């Protein structure tokens, strides 16, 4: 089928408005333009953005001679409770805000101009635990074809074996006829289809797809006057006593959880922003992404294929127990099978997708009904695609606590909270909501630290409340359960364990455990890159920026990324590179010297707020806390030619030093056990002059694409001055400014 992009020609307005809509280009996040107020019902979840319902309009022109053709609209993502109307008739309803879905236009079209309306609802707040965005935030396209055509998503490709490399290609057609298939480097082949044609091809000297060598092949299928083009990778996935293997070789999944937003762009799924995010994560040392907690975009899959990034595509954040008042729970039972079907159809041909996850921190897995549902969903996914394992991210400690009544969400609580919020809003006052569910536990962990959650997971009751659900998935997904790994691998000799959500400071420990135990298949840190909403959960901010640490209106992001909201790698990213053996370091990072000893906002998801800078103007004479990250026997730290200290590195790749701050040259040197130098890292203090330096990430950019430009206060040589402050005004000639901001949560 032929795809026509429908990114332009749209207007958007609040549903019910009588004024003409504003002209917009898709993908479009309508929520990003809304005010942030203390009365926002989404509150800390959404970064204080208000929620509204939206109406999008455009026309579709259908020539008289094409009216009998097949016309199918594809919406890649509409948040949420989407309605599609054609010529005044309701053509479709799809409640889940993160799924792609299709609309058969045939019953509603006429020749000439047709009115297309799409409604996206987001006034029903709160409906998400993080910033969702709203509207048509992913692309829309129209698929068309004549009577004889290849069905939409009608080409399926899988690798059968590697020696020799054999791929199976299934083609589904709307009618009988001859199917012609071309794969680069192979002769053209033809088969007759009775609705399906199956090709088995041998590829000599195949170029395999791996994270290190993401080789892709192009497959072109022709049937009658129709054509479909797919890319695929030759690769196999296996799981068992040898752990997780790709092409027969064990691969340790070293991943990062990410939300779907793109920072300053909001929820807009821009291919350039997505490509940048994948690149930054890979440079940090990750080889995998967990799409938390919803199916990822097609743009992300294409980039992960191209760049060599493994993907765990996750379905949802809840099943039948609410986490927010107006979430997907009322629709879940009716729609989960269709949602999973669409997720698998989207993912099937992508070599990057190696895992499916049915959910995140679903405490339903502690209940008899939820245990049965775990098996039902796993089996359903196996029926759709048996080539990939199925997991579910289970917070072991939360399962136990929720089973004895702590922090449980209920409809009764929701009703009371909604009534309080409505009364407060009517009076023009903000209301502080009682934390329940995941937020209750996250707040508790923030106050008590990561050890609270990890130690809690070792309780016997945690095993009791998870073991039956774990038996109903291919790989057991442990959220914050690292202290259980050794015990459970011994107790359950058939179990494979995935750290489906973990703390940054456990990266080294995980890597060393995984190297010794194949059934520990991988790890996904929370989180790889900062994201909008769920404010303050992963941030260390001081009182000059965040009075009272209350997560109030000034906050917009979580602050929990190893990479900040603007895409800048932090000290934690440098630690991660070393812990995951991207390289051996050394790297130096320095905690903010202007705040040495000061209290900061609490978070278990922050390992350090150190940054690679030795330019702390006005802090002369104050104590500086310095961190060195290296895989080495020992490290030395030097300041202005004199040694500050030596530290042996045992069971970690992290050394701390303390010194009185003075400008100059700070240098770390790493050594092996024989005393041979392995590497060195230097930080130099910036000079007196201060200027704004604009640094584009690309040397050139094509029309219609993004160019990220970092603005920094620096000296004349380009050394950043982290304490310099000021107001910046930006004007763009020859382009459009689509986002401007800093990384302060």
Segments from the language model and where they lie:
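Accessory beta-strand-rich segments of carbohydrate-active enzymes
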Residues: 3-16, 30, 46, 51-151, ...
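Core domains of carbohydrate- and sulfate-ester-processing enzymes
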Residues: 4-53, 105, 118-153, 242, ...
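Substrate-binding clefts and catalytic carboxylate motifs of secreted carbohydrate-active enzymes
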Residues: 4-7, 11-18, 78, 125, ...
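Active-site-adjacent substrate/metal-binding segments within catalytic domains
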Residues: 35-62, 66-75, 79-86, 92-95, ...
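Aromatic/hydrophobic beta-strand junction motif of beta-rich domains
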Residues: 75, 167-175, 248, 624-630, ...
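Extended acidic/polar, glycine-enriched regions
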Residues: 110-111, 170-239, 654-656, 660-664, ...
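Conserved structural position at the C-terminal beta-strand
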Residues: 120, 221-223, 670, 713
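Short flexible loop/turn segments that cap and initiate beta-strands
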Residues: 179, 212-216, 623-625, 631-633, ...
């Amino acid at each position: 089928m032929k795809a026509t992009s429908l990114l332009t020609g749209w207007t958007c307005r609040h549903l019910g408005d009588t004024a003409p809509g504003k002209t917009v280009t898709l993908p479009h996040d309508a929520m990003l333009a809304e005010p942030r107020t203390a009365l926002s019902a989404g509150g800390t979840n959404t970064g204080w953005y208000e929620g509204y319902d939206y109406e999008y309009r455009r026309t579709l022109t259908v020539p008289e001679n094409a009216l009998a053709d097949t016309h199918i609209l594809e919406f890649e993502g509409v948040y949420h409770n989407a309605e599609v109307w054609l010529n005044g008739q309701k053509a479709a309803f799809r409640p889940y805000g993160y799924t792609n879905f299709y609309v058969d236009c045939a019953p509603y079209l006429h020749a000439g101009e047709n009115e297309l309306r799409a409604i996206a609802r987001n006034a029903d707040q709160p409906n998400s635990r993080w910033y969702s965005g709203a509207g048509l935030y992913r692309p829309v396209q129209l698929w068309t074809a004549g009577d004889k055509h290849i069905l939409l998503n009608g080409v399926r490709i899988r690798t059968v074996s590697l020696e020799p490399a054999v791929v199976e290609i299934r083609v589904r057609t709307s009618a009988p006829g001859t199917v012609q298939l071309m794969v680069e480097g192979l002769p053209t082949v033809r088969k007759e289809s009775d609705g399906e044609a199956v090709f088995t091809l041998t590829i000599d000297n195949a170029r395999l797809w791996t994270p290190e060598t993401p080789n892709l092949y192009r497959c072109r299928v022709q049937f009658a006057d129709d054509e479909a083009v797919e890319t695929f990778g030759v690769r196999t996935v296996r799981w068992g006593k040898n752990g997780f293997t790709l092409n027969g070789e064990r691969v340790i999944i070293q991943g990062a959880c990410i939300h779907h937003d793109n920072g300053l762009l909001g929820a807009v799924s821009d291919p350039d922003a997505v490509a940048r995010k994948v690149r930054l994560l890979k440079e940090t040392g990750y080889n995998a992404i967990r799409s938390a907690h919803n199916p990822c975009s097609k743009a992300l899959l294409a980039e992960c294929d191209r760049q060599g990034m493994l993907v765990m595509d996750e379905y949802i954040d809840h099943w039948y127990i609410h986490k927010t008042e107006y979430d997907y729970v009322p629709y879940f039972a009716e729609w989960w099978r269709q949602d999973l079907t669409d997720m698998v159809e989207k993912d099937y041909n992508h070599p990057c997708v190696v895992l499916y996850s049915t959910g995140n921190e679903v405490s339903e897995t502690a209940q008899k009904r939820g245990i049965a549902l775990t098996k039902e969903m796993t089996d359903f996914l196996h029926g759709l695609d048996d080539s990939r394992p199925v997991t579910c991210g289970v917070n072991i400690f939360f399962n136990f606590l929720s089973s004895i009544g702590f922090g449980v969400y209920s409809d009764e609580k929701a009703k009371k909270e909604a009534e309080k919020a409505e009364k407060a809003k009517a009076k023009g006052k903000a209301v502080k909501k009682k934390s329940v569910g995941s937020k209750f536990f996250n707040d508790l962990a923030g106050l008590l630290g990561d050890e609270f959650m990890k130690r809690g997971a070792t309780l016997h009751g945690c095993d009791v409340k998870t073991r039956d659900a774990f038996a109903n998935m291919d790989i057991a997904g442990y959220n914050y359960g690292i202290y259980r790994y050794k015990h459970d691998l011994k107790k359950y000799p058939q179990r494979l364990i995935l750290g489906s959500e973990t703390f940054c400071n456990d990266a080294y420990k995980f890597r060393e455990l995984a190297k010794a135990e194949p059934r520990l298949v991988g790890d996904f840190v929370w989180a790889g890159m900062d994201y909008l909403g769920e404010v303050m959960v992963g941030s260390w901010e001081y009182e000059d920026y965040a009075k009272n640490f209350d997560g109030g209106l000034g906050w917009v992001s979580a602050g929990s990324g190893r990479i900040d909201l603007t895409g800048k790698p932090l000290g934690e990213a440098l630690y991660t590179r070393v812990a995951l053996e991207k390289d051996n370091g050394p790297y130096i990072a320095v905690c903010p010297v202007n705040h040495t000893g000061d209290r900061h906002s609490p978070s278990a998801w922050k390992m350090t707020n150190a940054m690679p800078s030795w330019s702390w103007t006005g802090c002369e004479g104050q104590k500086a806390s310095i961190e060195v990250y290296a895989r080495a026997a020992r490290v030395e730290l030097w300041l202005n030619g004199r040694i500050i200290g030596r530290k042996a590195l045992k069971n970690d790749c992290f050394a701390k030093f303390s010194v009185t701050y003075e400008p100059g040259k700070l240098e770390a040197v790493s050594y092996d056990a024989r005393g041979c130098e392995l590497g060195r890292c230097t930080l130099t203090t910036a000079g007196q002059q201060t200027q704004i330096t604009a640094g584009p990430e690309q040397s050139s950019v094509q029309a219609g694409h993004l160019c990220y430009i970092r603005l920094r206060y620096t000296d004349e040589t380009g050394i950043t001055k982290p304490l310099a402050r000021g107001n910046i005004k930006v004007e763009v000639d020859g382009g459009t400014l689509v986002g401007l901001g800093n990384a302060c949560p």
